[in-house]
Regions:
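Aromatic- and charge-enriched surface segment that lines or borders ligand/interaction sites
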Residues: 1-43, 77, 167, 215-217
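Surface-exposed binding/hinge segments that line
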Residues: 8-10, 27-29, 36, 45-103
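Alpha-to-beta junction loops
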Residues: 28, 74-76, 169-178, 192
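Gly/Pro-rich hinge or "lid" segments in bacterial periplasmic/extracellular proteins
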Residues: 63-66, 80-148, 152
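Periplasmic-binding protein-like
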Residues: 91, 197-209, 212, 216-237
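Ligand-site clamp/hinge motif
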Residues: 107, 112-115, 140-186, 223
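Ligand-binding "clamshell"
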Residues: 185-198
Length: 237
């Protein structure tokens, strides 16, 4: 809407969760209510707190987020309590991922741990997880878009840098992030320099004023701090 308070989303048809359930507007409704549920104590509830009625649910004063309206199976309308410029950008972040109602309700405490109930809509699905050791993903063959070109991914966790480097150089790892401490070693090595890949990682960094602080609640102080920031230097760091 022109006042920046109302957003209407038309969902793509045929997008399926890994349990075969189609993603529908009801899943969006369920997700937002679940994220704001006081009992869930979700650390990512801030993603939706600007939606009308969300803070009331988080405070235990209401059962449902009033600003979420299901129009039909593939259309949902979200109404905000106040204009929030980064709203659309925040919805693209991982904490705003949509849950499948059936998987969460049937899985209970197993959701997030058991592959049967931990489902998404991506081109890779959860196969198994050995806590603090590894996570295995496999290709989703009925993915709604172009399928992955590899059959799966194995993530190894909690490997110290020296062991990780040795495994990579022995061909036991296909990919390894490097930091500045070993960058020069690889970039100057004829064997490895052509295998280095530089890329821009999509991210959004920002500074936020805590307006619960009486000083930061004053617009003059916020403007003064904003004007004092050297944007050119800030953007280069």
């Amino acid at each position: 809407s022109k006042d920046g308070l109302k957003f209407t989303f038309h969902q793509r048809k045929g997008v399926k969760f890994h349990n075969g359930e189609e993603l529908k507007a009801d899943d969006v409704l369920f997700t937002i209510n679940k994220m704001m549920d006081k009992k869930a104590a979700n650390i990512n509830s801030y993603q939706f707190e600007m939606i009308k009625g969300a803070k009331e649910v988080l405070a235990g004063k209401a059962d449902k987020v009033s600003g979420v309206k299901v129009i039909d199976d593939y259309t949902v309308e979200l109404t905000l309590s106040y204009p929030y410029a980064p709203f659309l950008a925040s919805l693209t972040s991982a904490p705003a991922s949509i849950f499948n109602r059936k998987a969460v309700e049937e899985g209970g405490d197993k959701f997030g741990f058991d592959p049967e109930y931990t489902v998404g809509t991506g081109y890779m699905k959860f196969k198994d997880w050995t806590q603090d050791k590894e996570i295995n993903l496999v290709r989703t063959d009925d993915y709604f878009n172009d399928p992955a070109k590899i059959s799966g991914v194995r993530y190894l966790m909690n490997i110290d840098k020296s062991t990780r480097r040795m495994m990579f150089e022995n061909g036991e790892l296909d990919y390894m992030p490097i930091d500045k401490t070993i960058y020069d070693t690889y970039v100057n090595d004829p064997l490895w320099k052509d295998n280095l890949i530089k890329f821009l990682a999509p991210s959004m960094d920002y500074l936020i004023f805590n307006q619960n602080d009486p000083n930061m609640a004053k617009v003059d102080i916020r403007q003064a701090v904003t004007k004092a920031i050297n944007r050119e230097v800030f953007n280069q760091t």
